[in-house]
UniProtKB/Swiss-Prot annotation:
The chain crosses the membrane at residues 486-506. Residues 507-518 are cytoplasmic. It comes from Halorubrum pleomorphic virus 1 (HRPV-1). One of its GO terms (cellular component) is virion membrane. Keywords: Glycoprotein, Membrane, Signal, Transmembrane, Transmembrane helix, Virion. N-glycosylated by a pentasaccharide comprising glucose, glucuronic acid and a terminal 5-N-formyl-legionaminic acid residue. Residues 32-485 are extracellular. This is Envelope protein. Envelope protein that may play a role in host-cell attachment and viral genome entry. Glycans are attached at N213. It comes from the Viruses. It is found in: Virion membrane.
Amino acid sequence: MSVNRSSIKSLLMVFMIVSSSLLAPVGGAAADEFRTPAASDTSPEAGECSNLDDFIMFLSVGRINADSCSRQAYVDAAVQDMKDSDANQTKVDIYSAAAGVKGGSETWAAPYDNYLNDTESIAWMKAESAIAQSYSEGESKTEAKVAAKAAIADYYATKQKNLIEQWNFANAQMFTLREQARMEDGISRNYVEPAYRNVEKTNSPDYSLAYSNTTVEKSLVDGTTVNTTGVSMDVTVQHTTVSDVATVSSGPVRAGKYNNQYNEWKATYYSWSVEPASPSQDTLYAVHFQPYADRWQRIVDMNGALQSEADNFVNATWDDYDTGQINASDVLSANTAMSEYGVRSGSESEGLWRSTAALSMMGYDTPNLNNSGMMTVEYKNVQHTGLLMAKNAPNGSWQVNTTYNTSNIDGPVFMATTEGTKLDFADGEEFTIVGMTAKDGTAVNSTQTTKYRYKTANTTELLEVQNQLIELRQEIEDREPEAGGFFGSGSTDTMLVGLLALAGVLLLAQSNNRGGRR
């Protein structure tokens, strides 16, 4: 097929003339109109161009439709779609994680609340043991009261520490989710934030809200202090910032400034909230402040009530002990003897030995005790069979063929016998364990005393990991490439003009060469 080379040459010349006119500098109002499309501009959406749109962009060397039809426009559109998709997925992830925080808090709360119901009896056992030990060591009435109150307070302080750890953990999770949302493009900076209600304001106040994770020092019932997380609500009204902090014991807090004056704003913050990830979801309230404050106050009230009971108990028993009518171990109830002074064998459950102590102290007949195993102790040349009980046995155990002196043992030492009686060992007296048997009658050489270690949760390492994750995510966000303009720089325009001119020269040269062979 023959090609009209003259036509091709003419079209090329027209194209170059048009291109050069489009690339030539334009001044005045015409330049502004050329560079800034009017509001009625009907350019195609970025990355969505027809063949005609692409052709117009090509003829104009990117001066027309470049924002929509260039390769970079398609890249920009794809990147934006990915960002939108990433943001939507992140919303789902954050919402799901917050739901997990809420569910975990509720799962923790049920057994914790139930356990608080039983703490009074356990704390009272601690008080009885402290009083008995104080009496046995010859301390004064006042010292016995102090010891009892300290035992109660130490016990409840542990419960406060556990509550604080849960509070710290839940709030650290929410702050982590908040930072994640704020670092993600396409997500509202307030997607995760403390929720507020009961707003008081005057006119249309100019205000701004900010939230931060702060450290607050809390006093425990035993007089010690610990650091805990505080959720700081920072309200700026008329260039004045007022900060109020929600803590483990505060419950909802009023934050802001309101005195019924011009431009003021104040509200009650009561929970962490997360916006819905989709239209089908509701706002999620993950960590409410009030339940933590209720638990804190409950611990304080229980501690206070038992402190008063300790005073009354010492007042009621001191005179009898001081006059020799009762021994130190007589202040121990059966439950305290079972839980605090019982022993267990390495091959048997603690429940077996505790029940043995309880049955003996309660006066049950010998078969019940004999079926549970026995210890044989020689005291003042007389052997007694039953269960030896003490608050602090030497090295935490009793050994067969070992002689003990009560002066070397802290607290009272006594024996629950198979006859249903209680045998007290006087201070400074010696006794020897001559034998021990297990429940099945086999001989054993040693047995341990009952010990309790009240543990507090430790979330420090977890919080450190979360902080590291926040920093890592920020680094990743900072390194994400931003899409740039392809036709926007002068150097790029110059390069394109050069390429077009070179293409024209080559085509003209090729045409001339072919023309010479005609």
